[in-house]
C-alpha cells in the first residue's frame, strides 16, 4: 500500500539584516533543516523557505552609521547570512528578502483586505520622541523597566524575561538607546489592527492543537484581558513600505515580516513553475504549513499572524513550533566572556555537522533552552560520532577492501540482528516527526553500541589471522557495514555531508527510508576514507577566542 505524499511548506524565522547570525540563531535553522530533510527522506514533498528581515529603524540607523543606503546594507547582510546558513548545510529552496516587490504587493493586499473589512482604524497616539536625534523612537530603541514583571533594561515592545508585550509609553523609566536622552511625548496619527475582533477565532485555533501545550497555555494567559488593537504603522523617517494613501506613514516591520514567508514562496513560484503559491496559502488549503520560531516572537506569530491571515482570506498555519534560547557554558551568550559566537566564526574552525549533531542530541519538542557546554560538546562528538558511529565502518572496511577486493558477502550471517535494527525505524521516525531529536539520537547511538558489541564479539582482526576463516571475516564485516548503512540512513537528516560520503563509500543509491530494508550483498564498495576528524580541545577552544 502506497501512502500519499504529504505537501509541506516549512519556514524558519527571518534573520534580521542588522548584524551577523550567531549560534543562537542556528538552533532554529538547524532544527527546521533536520525536520525538512527527514520529511524528504520519507518521500514527502517539502518546501523550505526563509529570507532576510529587511525593514525597520534599526536597519536605517545601522546603515547610516556605516555610510550606506539601507538597501545596500540589506544586500550585504543577505549575502553574509546566505553564506553562513549554507555553511551550516541549511538547504533552503529560497532565501529571499522582505524588501521585495512581492512582499510590498502582498503587504498592501493584506492591509487593504483588512481595511475593507473594517479591521483597520486610525487613532492619534502619544509617542516617544528623541528630542536630541529628532526622531520618533521605535520600540527597540527605548530601554526601561517592564511594566508587567519589573525586569530592568527591557525593550520598548516586549519583555525578554516574562514575554509580555506592551506599548513603549507603558515602559517604566525609559531612555533613548540612540542618545541616552529621556524621550518626550509627541502626538501622531497611527493605524491599528483590531486584534480583539479575532479573539474567538484565535481561542478556537489555539485549542485545536496547533501549538505545543506550553505555548498554548502561555497564550491563554493573554486572553485573561481583552486583546489590544495592534499598532501597525510607523512615522517617517523609516525604512520599509509606505502605507497606501497615507503620507509619511510606513508599515511596522512586524506587519510585513511574516508576510515575507508568503513573498519568498511567491518569488520561488516565479523561479519554479511547479510551485503553486495558492496551493499553500489559499483558504481551506489541504497542504501543511509549519513555522519554526523562537519563544521571543511567539506573540507575533501565534496571535497577530493567524488573525491577519484569517482576516485577509488566507489559510492558517498547521503548527507553529517554538524553541528556547541557547546558552553557552550555562550562561547567556556574552561578548565579554567570548561566548557570543557567530556562525561565521564557528565555521572558520569546526565542521558544521558537529554542531548539527550536538543540537540534535539536545533538542526536544519542549520549549526549553539548550546549553552549548564546550566540554560536553567535545565529549559528545568524539564519543558518539567518532567512537561509535564512524568507528564501526572503519573497523570493517579495511578487511573488505584489503582481503576481498571491496566485495561484500552474499548473505548476512546475523539476519535477525539486521532485522532488529530495522524494527526501530518507526520509533526513530516518530521521534523525528515530533521534533524529539534527542530521543532519536539516543536510540541511534544505542544501536551503534550494539553494532560495535557485535564486532567486538566476533573479532574479525583475530579471525583474519586464523586458517580457513576468510568467509567468516567477510561475513562479519558485511554485517557490520550493513548495520552502518542503517545507522547512516537514520542520521542522514542530521549529517547530510557525511551521509553523502558514506553513499560514495558504499557505492550505493541515495540512502532513504524506502531502500532502508534492502541490505548490500554480493556488492562492491569503494576504499574507505576517513569520514570525520576527532575534535581536539584546542580546536574547540578557538570558538571562544577571536
UniProtKB/Swiss-Prot annotation:
One of its GO terms (cellular component) is cytosol. The keyword ATP-binding applies. It comes from the Bacteria. GO terms for molecular function: ATP binding; metal ion binding; methionine-tRNA ligase activity. CDD domains: Anticodon_Ia_Met, MetRS_core. It is found in: Cytoplasm. It is an enzyme of class 6 (ligase). Belongs to the class-I aminoacyl-tRNA synthetase family. MetG type 1 subfamily. This is Methionine--tRNA ligase. It comes from Coxiella burnetii (strain RSA 493 / Nine Mile phase I). The gene is metG.
Amino acid at each position: 500500500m502506497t501512502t500519499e505524499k504529504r505537501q509541506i511548506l516549512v519556514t524558519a524565522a527571518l534573520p534580521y539584516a542588522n548584524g551577523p547570525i550567531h549560534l543562537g540563531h542556528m538552533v532554529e535553522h538547524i532544527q527546521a533543516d533536520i525536520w525538512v530533510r527527514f520529511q524528504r527522506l520519507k518521500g514527502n514533498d517539502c518546501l523550505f523557505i526563509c529570507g532576510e528581515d529587511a525593514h525597520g529603524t534599526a536597519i536605517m540607523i545601522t546603515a547610516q552609521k556605516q555610510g550606506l543606503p539601507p538597501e545596500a546594507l540589506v544586500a550585504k547582510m543577505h549575502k553574509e547570512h546566505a553564506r553562513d546558513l549554507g555553511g551550516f548545510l541549511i538547504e533552503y529552496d529560497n532565501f529571499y528578502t522582505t524588501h521585495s516587490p512581492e512582499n510590498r504587493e502582498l503587504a498592501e493586499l493584506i492591509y487593504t483586505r483588512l481595511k475593507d473589512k473594517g479591521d483597520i482604524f486610525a487613532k492619534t497616539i502619544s509617542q516617544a520622541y528623541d528630542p536630541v536625534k529628532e526622531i520618533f523612537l521605535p520600540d527597540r530603541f527605548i530601554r526601561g523597566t517592564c511594566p508587567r514583571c519589573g525586569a530592568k533594561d527591557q525593550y520598548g515592545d516586549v519583555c525578554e524575561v516574562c514575554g509580555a508585550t506592551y506599548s513603549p509609553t507603558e515602559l517604566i523609566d525609559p531612555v533613548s538607546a540612540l542618545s541616552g536622552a529621556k524621550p518626550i511625548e509627541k502626538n501622531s496619527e497611527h493605524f491599528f489592527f483590531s486584534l480583539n475582533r479575532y479573539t474567538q477565532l484565535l481561542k478556537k485555533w489555539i485549542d485545536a492543537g496547533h501549538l505545543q501545550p506550553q505555548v498554548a497555555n502561555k497564550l491563554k494567559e493573554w486572553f485573561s484581558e481583552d486583546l489590544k488593537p495592534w499598532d501597525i504603522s510607523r512615522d517617517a523617517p523609516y525604512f520599509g513600505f509606505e502605507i497606501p494613501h497615507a503620507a509619511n506613514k510606513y508599515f511596522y516591520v512586524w506587519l510585513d515580516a511574516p508576510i515575507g514567508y508568503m513573498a519568498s514562496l511567491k518569488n520561488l513560484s516565479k523561479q519554479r513553475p511547479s510551485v503553486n503559491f495558492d496551493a499553500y496559502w489559499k483558504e481551506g488549503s489541504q497542504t501543511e504549513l509549519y513555522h519554526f520560531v523562537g519563544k521571543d516572537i511567539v506573540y507575533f506569530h501565534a496571535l497577530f499572524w493567524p488573525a491577519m491571515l484569517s482576516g485577509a482570506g488566507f489559510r492558517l498555519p498547521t503548527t507553529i513550533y517554538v524553541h528556547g534560547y541557547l546558552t553557552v557554558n550555562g550562561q547567556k551568550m556574552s561578548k565579554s566572556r567570548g561566548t557570543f559566537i557567530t556562525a561565521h566564526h564557528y565555521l572558520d574552525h569546526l565542521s558544521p555537522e558537529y554542531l548539527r549533531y550536538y543540537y540534535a542530541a539536545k533538542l526536544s519538542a519542549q520549549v526549553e533552552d539548550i546549553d552549548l557546554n564546550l566540554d560536553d560538546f567535545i565529549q559528545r562528538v568524539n564519543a558518539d560520532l567518532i567512537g561509535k558511529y564512524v568507528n564501526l565502518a572503519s573497523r570493517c572496511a579495511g578487511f573488505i577492501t584489503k582481503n576481498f577486493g571491496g566485495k561484500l558477502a552474499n548473505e548476512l550471517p546475523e539476519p535477525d540482528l539486521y532485522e532488529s535494527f530495522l524494527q526501530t525505524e518507526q520509533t526513530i521516525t516518530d521521534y523525528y516527526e515530533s521534533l524529539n531529536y534527542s530521543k532519536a539520537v539516543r536510540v541511534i547511538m544505542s544501536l551503534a553500541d550494539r553494532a560495535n558489541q557485535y564486532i567486538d564479539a566476533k573479532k574479525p582482526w583475530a579471525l583474519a589471522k586464523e586458517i580457513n576463516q576468510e568467509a567468516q571475516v567477510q561475513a562479519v564485516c558485511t554485517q557490520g557495514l550493513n548495520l552502518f548503512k542503517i545507522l547512516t540512513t537514520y542520521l542522514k537528516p542530521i549529517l547530510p555531508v557525511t551521509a553523502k560520503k558514506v553513499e560514495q563509500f558504499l557505492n550505493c543509491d541515495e540512502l532513504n527510508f524506502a531502500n532502508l530494508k534492502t541490505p548490500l550483498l554480493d556488492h562492491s564498495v569503494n576504499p574507505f576514507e576517513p569520514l570525520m576528524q576527532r575534535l581536539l580541545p584546542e580546536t574547540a577552544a578557538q570558538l571562544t577566542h577571536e
